[in-house]
Amino acid sequence: MKKVHERFLEYVKVDTKSDETTRVTPSTKGQLELGKILAEELKEIGVDEVRISDKGYVYACLKSNCDKDIPKIGFISHMDTAPDMSGKNVNPKIVENYDGKDIELGNGYTLSPSFSPELPMYKGQTLITTDGTTLLGADDKAGVAEIVTAIEYLINNPEIKHGDIKIGFTPDEEIGEGADHFDVEGFGADFAYTLDGGRIGELEYENFNAASAKVEIIGKNVHPGSAKGKMINSILVAHEFVSMLPLDEVPEKTEGYEGFSFLLDIQGEVEKTSLSFIIRDFDKEGFKNRKERFNEIAKELNKKYGEGTVTVTLKDQYMNMKEMIEPRMHIVETAEKAMKQCGIEPIKNPIRGGTDGARLSFMGLPTPNLFTGGENFHGRYEYISINSMEKAVEVILNIIKIYAEK
């Protein structure tokens, strides 16, 4: 039987960086390649009903081995890695018996406790890091490896009783499209867990309400020598727009349950400037107010510079899954129990982001999020503890056992 980290090291060889500009699903060929590898591997270890959809989603089912009426549990992870950094030619480094000090990644980069204060907690463990030139891909290939390893363990140990176990691997989660074509009905689970969290112990069932905002500003360009009273510099109007938002309600100044507006991108010249924002808030009313503020600013600036100068386009992305999880809190409580059984203290913090599970919960499949063990996702300083990965496998197995024993 393969060890979980061995699987992980195989999966990261496949470049699955997603790309929101391609407008196809999956957005990159590497995701389809990994999906085919996973489907074949699941068949080889004895999983039933393995299929890949025309959109690259991998679905499988390990059939029940007992007569009891046991809930059908799903486990889901995503195959893509973040567009933030290259996932090509990932060259993982194994750091055995970590000494708690700086780790030289190579290529002039160092992973240090001063940058990652949590590092010393992994002293004595074996870590997998990058070589400094790419991300690692623990988000979320660690989750994929943990699910496959847990399933293989069940197959190799048939004395462990379980109901139907549903498996799902999705593309394009990192660009917000992971649930777009997910076949909830065909998946057939009563509820599910995503393996897409970070540090060991993380158990998440609250996430941001999320929207995107596109702001387009139309200016008027005339010769600067005769511009007085005529020119409207769209770049400066854009600056004015941003300054009218709460200046302290930005990602770098917020934490916990605090929301924000985040200016992601600005492209402009005198006659036209475009701004791209994301809007985030845990509270429904606060979320509504943040979106309304964008429209109010546009209204004020249009009054000042002329109707049609500023246009705002808002688009909801996902909502806080808490309201869909709370009526079935046994899903969360079972995960807590499963963690405690293997010596892990659950960490229940809100997700300052989103997962496939957030949208799936609103599609009728309640899906809280479990840890994978990774740290510093989406960049060259990403790493993961093999011990944490092994514990994630244990938690999956414990959840399955708890429901089988009820």
Swiss-Prot record:
Signal peptide: none annotated. Keywords: Aminopeptidase, Cytoplasm, Hydrolase, Metal-binding, Metalloprotease, Protease, Zinc. GO terms for biological process: peptide catabolic process; proteolysis. It catalyses: Release of the N-terminal residue from a tripeptide. One of its GO terms (cellular component) is cytosol. It is an enzyme of class 3 (hydrolase). PANTHER family: PEPTIDASE T. This is Peptidase T.
